[in-house]
Amino acid sequence: MANTVFNNKIIEAKAKDLLTTQVNARSLMTVDNSLTQEAGMTKTINVYTYSGTAEEVAAGEGNSSRGSISYVGKDYTVKMVQQAFDYQDEDFLKDNTIVDNMVKGATQVMTNKMTEDFVTEAKKATVSHEAATFGYDAIVDAISKVNLENEADLFVIIPNEWKADIRKDEDYKAARMGEVVYSGQVGTVCGIPVIATKALTDEAFVLTKEAVKLFIKKDVEVEQERDADTRTNSVYLRACYICALENADKIVKVTKAA
């Protein structure tokens, strides 16, 4: 029987494309694929705050004060996320798409893990808003706490169970009646997309994707093993990354009052 081990580069290309596409499609965070550190190494991420005043100056005069910048650094350990799967030569003969489907499933699991890490970082938000009930008013109040002049990049993510709260809201119904909602998006509030996800349970977030950043190595590592006797092929997919709350000014946590 022919050896059906795939070229590592082929699997790597498939996994890289799927992983990057699925993370970006969520539009939850900024993706930076320039990470150079290895798993277990530390990367320090600094959050900067600039303070200063623009002054009018007459001819020959200078500023009365200077601007300054401060920063808080936090160390993050680079993670290794790995998925492994096996297939036999006989499996491939029965269905030659089995490896493609396994790569797709493996990268989806890896993506879900990164989503969990995103939620962990989002929970570190320093600005919060507590509402008696969740609905139009709660979202509007949270948006005001983000305090952005340009709200075009804002979006809201909510627990799947909270969709009913919004859909029953009279203000929402008046604004959205008759419209069709597609692909998991609940709709918009004040022109801002509201997205429901099972990754959240008891809190929502109003944010831009600048709040959380995913630092990920550009290349997906692929390793394979083969047991010639049983014709079993093992495939390992690995990716190194860090998920970090990088801009706490761009996110507000919303909770329901107990």
Language-model features: locations:
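Short glycine/proline-enriched loop/turn "hinge" motifs that connect secondary-structure elements
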Residues: 70-79
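Extended, compositionally biased alpha-helical segments that mediate assembly or anchoring
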Residues: 226, 230-258
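N-terminal "assembly arms/tails" that initiate or stabilize quaternary assembly
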Residues: 1-71, 213-223, 228-230, 234, ...
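Short, structured patches in soluble enzyme cores that scaffold and shape functional sites
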Residues: 89, 158-160, 239
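Alpha-helical scaffold segments that mediate packing/assembly in large oligomeric complexes
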Residues: 82, 86-151, 253-258
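Short helix/loop capping segments that flank catalytic or ligand/cofactor-binding pockets
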Residues: 53-56, 95, 165-167, 244-246
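Extended oligomerization regions of viral-like shell subunits
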Residues: 43, 137-229
